[in-house]
């Protein structure tokens, strides 16, 4: 029996079958009807970590290649789809982490649930989203930061985009987005839209040879200034509160974003170190987790302290300006 049919019948796929199914989807070899049946069946049954990892491998292989030599290579990324409409914290945290000396390949797309995804925000900040992949790779090598726009790096997604759009429900691709970094990031802070995905996504990361933290905070795919749940790859689960890392508690409301232009103005103030308060603290928390995940600091608390120093220095804004200019050169 073929693997697509097997999945539609609700059976768990072997690793090789999951890989083969995704390879076929990326090659446009699966009809829209069968593709829809497959995606819905997987979602209803619940994707297994070995299936997710195998599919991520196939998607990475179908992506436009980007060879980056710097290691560790960090990505701070979320699944999206949490419906919370928060400010794009992961994007700003990625710039802070890079300004603090960790090489970052930030993989992202346009908005999933907020009014502004990472691509929307960076575009409003002057970043050329359509820059050639090799130029983005050079930026990571030279500046320590690059934005990998999913639409540019994953052209094979055109085969499944209409099916996903028409279904309008969560599919395995919501989980695969963060795992398919074309530069092959090996350190992650990965936010998930629901706590049930913490352990499976951590296992998928481990199977892909990556380290890091899978996080969920009060219904959001981000670390928030309240109750967070974390699964550290290969190390287990724990709760995390802002007080433990020297930050003040704040409600989710305080982390809400607006449209791209509004967010861009706020982002500039944050990156220049001019914005104090909950948003700056939330960015420091995510960037601090990034420093810890990449092995830059021995603890999350020290990571947050370093992130606050970097934010206050305005270095992250200077890096953004250099990156914008580098892509235009």
From Swiss-Prot:
It catalyses: N-(5-phospho-beta-D-ribosyl)anthranilate + diphosphate = 5-phospho-alpha-D-ribose 1-diphosphate + anthranilate. Keywords: Amino-acid biosynthesis, Aromatic amino acid biosynthesis, Glycosyltransferase, Magnesium, Metal-binding, Transferase, Tryptophan biosynthesis. InterPro entries: Anthranilate_Pribosyl_Tfrase (IPR005940), Glycosyl_Trfase_fam3 (IPR000312), Glycosyl_Trfase_fam3_N_dom (IPR017459), Glycosyl_Trfase_fam3_N_dom_sf (IPR036320), Nuc_phospho_transferase (IPR035902). It is an enzyme of class 2 (transferase). Its cofactor is Mg(2+). Mg(2+) 1 binds at residues 90, 222. Pfam families: Glycos_trans_3N, Glycos_transf_3. GO terms for molecular function: anthranilate phosphoribosyltransferase activity; magnesium ion binding. Anthranilate 1 binds at residues 78, 109. Anthranilate 2 binds at residue 164. GO terms for biological process: L-tryptophan biosynthetic process. Mg(2+) 2 binds at residues 221-222. 5-phospho-alpha-D-ribose 1-diphosphate binds at residues 78, 81-82, 88-91, 106-114, 118. Catalyzes the transfer of the phosphoribosyl group of 5-phosphorylribose-1-pyrophosphate (PRPP) to anthranilate to yield N-(5'-phosphoribosyl)-anthranilate (PRA). NCBIfam families: trpD (TIGR01245). Homodimer. Belongs to the anthranilate phosphoribosyltransferase family. This is Anthranilate phosphoribosyltransferase. The gene is trpD.
């Amino acid at each position: 029996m073929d693997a697509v049919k097997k999945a539609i019948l609700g059976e768990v796929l072997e690793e090789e079958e999951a890989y083969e199914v995704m390879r076929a989807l990326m090659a446009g070899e699966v009809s829209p009807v069968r593709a829809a049946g497959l995606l819905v069946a997987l979602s209803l049954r619940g994707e297994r970590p070995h299936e997710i990892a195998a599919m991520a491998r196939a998607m990475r292989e179908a992506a436009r290649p980007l060879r980056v030599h710097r290691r560790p290579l960090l990505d701070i990324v979320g699944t999206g789809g949490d419906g919370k409409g928060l400010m794009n914290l992961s994007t700003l945290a990625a710039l802070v982490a890079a300004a603090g000396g960790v090489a970052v390949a930030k993989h992202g797309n346009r908005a999933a649930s907020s009014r502004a995804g990472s691509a929307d925000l960076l575009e409003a900040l002057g970043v050329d989203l359509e820059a050639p992949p090799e130029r983005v790779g050079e930026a990571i090598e030279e500046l320590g930061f690059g934005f990998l726009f999913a639409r540019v790096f994953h052209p094979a997604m055109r085969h499944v985009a209409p099916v996903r759009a028409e279904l309008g429900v969560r599919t395995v691709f919501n989980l695969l987005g963060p795992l398919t970094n074309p530069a092959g990031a090996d350190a992650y802070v990965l936010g998930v839209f629901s706590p049930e995905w913490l352990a499976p996504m951590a296992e998928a990361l481990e199977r892909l040879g990556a380290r890091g933290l899978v996080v969920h905070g009060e219904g959001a795919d981000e670390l928030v200034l309240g109750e967070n749940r974390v699964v550290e790859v290969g190390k287990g689960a724990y709760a995390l509160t802002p007080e433990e890392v020297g930050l003040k508690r704040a409600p989710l409301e305080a982390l809400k974003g607006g449209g791209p232009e509004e967010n861009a103005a706020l982002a500039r103030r944050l990156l220049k170190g001019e914005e104090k308060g909950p948003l700056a603290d939330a960015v420091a928390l995510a960037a601090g987790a990034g420093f810890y995940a990449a092995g830059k600091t021995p603890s999350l608390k020290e990571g947050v302290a370093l992130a606050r120093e970097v934010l206050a220095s305005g270095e992250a804004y200077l890096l953004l300006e250099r990156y914008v200019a580098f892509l235009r050169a």
